[in-house]
Amino acid sequence: EDTGSEATNNTEVSLPKPPVIENGYVEHMIRYQCKPFYKLHTEGDGVYTLNSEKHWTNKAVGEKLPECEAVCGKPKNPVDQVQRIMGGSVDAKGSFPWQAKMVSHHNLTSGATLINEQWLLTTAKNLFLGHKDDAKANDIAPTLKLYVGKNQLVEVEKVVLHPDYSKVDIGLIKLKQKVPIDERVMPICLPSKDYAEVGRIGYVSGWGRNSNFNFTELLKYVMLPVADQDKCVQHYEGSTVPEKKSPKSPVGVQPILNEHTFCAGMSKFQEDTCYGDAGSAFAVHDQDEDTWYAAGILSFDKSCTVAEYGVYVKVPSVLAWVQETIAGN
């Protein structure tokens, strides 16, 4: 078997001739493997045999070649589960390699979340920052600056807004090129099940703002529990009964709360700092699979201790739309 590190690029490599055995014959086989941070995607097993027509074929898929796709949700240095973070901690180890930084054309920073080698999720509100309400996706895309990993600038090809973005605060960003995956840049997995049950702990990362409302240059993260939805609705809307609702948001901005959202909040003893950026993932660790999933995307940030809850769009609510959009673009 030739398991050479780099697949031989149409250049003949002289291998020693295998010894002949009595009543036997030699069959030429190769096995495809992927570089670190990528995994083999194929219905076969990656092993190909040279047939009589001198074509490499696999038992299950014939001549169709496998692909190497990015591994998701497996950070090399996952955040320390034991640490209880209330004030927000600096991410020195690259525990959130899916976190991207988005800068609008008038220099407002927000977050975005890498979900494969070429696509990111963010909020529709982020995409409209500094644009008129009737701006088109084609006008927005060229105005964005996007950074992944250690401040690596990546070029945006297009923006796709959720068809119902006034209710579902979500948009997708496609990059011009696939971004190479390594320990600093890795997508988070998208969940097919709902991880947002009350009390579940998730991690939110972002550049946030310090108490002077200045953006910080260091990625920070905070650990938060999923909150009771009714309490959150009462906090922002005064009542869970539609007729009795009156917007009473303590911060003057009304978050979008509906069946596509969940809330997460902290104890009241938080420091005078805002964490997380809209567009960042509510990342949960599935311990059975040892995999990190984006349960939600931060839509409305708690505004520095005044409001108790952050509001997130449920990723399973938009999963079908995300998959269709990526497949069609």
Swiss-Prot record:
Protein name: Haptoglobin
Record-annotated Sushi domain positions: 13-70
Residues with attached carbohydrate: 9, 107, 214
Classification via SMART domains: Tryp_SPc
Record GO biological process: acute-phase response; defense response to bacterium; immune system process; zymogen activation
Disulfide bonds: 34-68, 72-189, 232-263, 274-304
Phylogenetic classification of the source organism: Eukaryota, Metazoa, Chordata, Craniata, Vertebrata
Function: As a result of hemolysis, hemoglobin is found to accumulate in the kidney and is secreted in the urine. Haptoglobin captures, and combines with free plasma hemoglobin to allow hepatic recycling of heme iron and to prevent kidney damage. Haptoglobin also acts as an antioxidant, has antibacterial activity and plays a role in modulating many aspects of the acute phase response. Hemoglobin/haptoglobin complexes are rapidly cleared by the macrophage CD163 scavenger receptor expressed on the surface of liver Kupfer cells through an endocytic lysosomal degradation pathway.
Alphabetized UniProt keyword annotations: Acute phase, Antibiotic, Antimicrobial, Antioxidant, Disulfide bond, Glycoprotein, Hemoglobin-binding, Immunity, Secreted, Serine protease homolog, Sushi
Tissue specificity statement from the Swiss-Prot or TrEMBL entry: Expressed by the liver and secreted in plasma.
Annotated source species: Canis lupus familiaris
Annotated GO CC locations: blood microparticle; extracellular space
Gene3D superfamilies reported for this sequence: Complement Module, domain 1 (2.10.70.10), Trypsin-like serine proteases (2.40.10.10)
Main localization, broad class: secreted
